[in-house]
Regions:
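Acidic, polar-rich low-complexity tracts and alpha-helical solenoid repeat scaffolds
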Residues: 1-277
Length: 277
């Protein structure tokens, strides 16, 4: 019902935009239609409306934004060649200079979508050099931080990149996600230190042959292992490593209260990976 109402509202706005003669007002209405449609992922309508904004709006900022959103829609619709060509053409036109940084980031996302990670990294590094202290450079640092995790598994480098986000542009929408990433990495490092300590103790027995880990110790150890499995699987997208930790919990601490939860988490992960198909 809500979707139908939204669609009808857009229909009425489009009719109004078609009738209105004043290009300024016409451009404003089409810009509103385009933004709402983009937010609701109705990309065909959004693209058509952004083209009308480009044609009618008297605002340079709106026209630039409409061009940027248009190439984003090409990418989201899978028209990667068109998106790439359009962006490269725009980067040669000084009319679009205020959004050059954003266009460069769109190229990064296009490269990423095609798994061209070397090209993406090179473009990100150039963004840091060419557009320092901007929204673009802040986002570039955030993406580089995620690449340090996903491509290199270098958490120290990731921390450095995430730490730069707020320094580059304190109002960036990536400041909070970067802080969350820092928190996740810090938690992971702390858990690894505890994990190593428990693993060392697990191998130690006293003179009577009694293991050094008490029942409480094993339950605490299970909590550490589960925390690592959760971070690996659901935060860092390292599914194989997450499964390794879950298997360890299942094998080493079968009497832990977390044992059933580990079995369930493993089943969910394997199901999502298509293991049971």
């Amino acid at each position: 019902f809500d979707e139908k109402m939204e669609s009808e509202s857009m229909d009425y706005l489009e009719k109004a935009a078609e009738i209105i003669k004043d290009p300024v007002e016409k451009g404003q209405i089409y810009y509103r239609i385009a933004d709402l449609s983009f937010e609701n992922k109705v990309y065909d309508r959004a693209l058509a409306s952004y083209q009308q904004v480009i044609k009618n709006s008297q605002s340079k900022k709106q026209v630039q934004e409409a061009n940027l959103r248009s190439v984003q829609i090409y990418r989201l619709n899978g028209d990667l060649d068109k998106a790439t060509k359009t962006i490269k053409d725009m980067l040669l036109d000084d009319v679009f200079k205020p959004i050059f940084g954003s266009l460069e980031l769109e190229l990064v996302k296009l490269y990423d979508q095609q798994k061209m990670f070397t090209e993406a990294n090179n473009r990100l590094e150039s963004i840091l050099q060419d557009y320092p202290k901007t929204k673009a450079s802040a986002e570039a640092y955030y993406i580089l931080g995620n690449y340090a995790i996903s491509q290199e598994w270098d958490l120290l480098e990731a921390l450095e990149h995430f730490g730069m986000v707020s320094r580059e542009f304190s109002k960036s929408m990536y400041v909070k996600p970067a802080l969350l990433r820092v928190k996740e990495i810090t938690s992971y490092d702390n858990l690894i230190a505890q994990y190593d300590s428990y693993m060392d103790r697990l191998l130690v027995v006293d003179t009577l042959g009694v293991p050094s880990l008490t029942i409480k110790d094993k339950n605490d150890f299970a909590t550490v292992i589960y925390g690592l499995a959760e971070l690996e699987s659901f935060h860092f997208s390292r599914i194989d490593s997450g499964i390794v930790y879950l298997n360890q919990l299942i094998q080493l601490t079968p009497n832990s209260p977390l044992y059933p939860k580990a079995l369930y988490a493993k089943a969910i992960i394997l199901d999502e990976q298509g293991y049971y198909k």
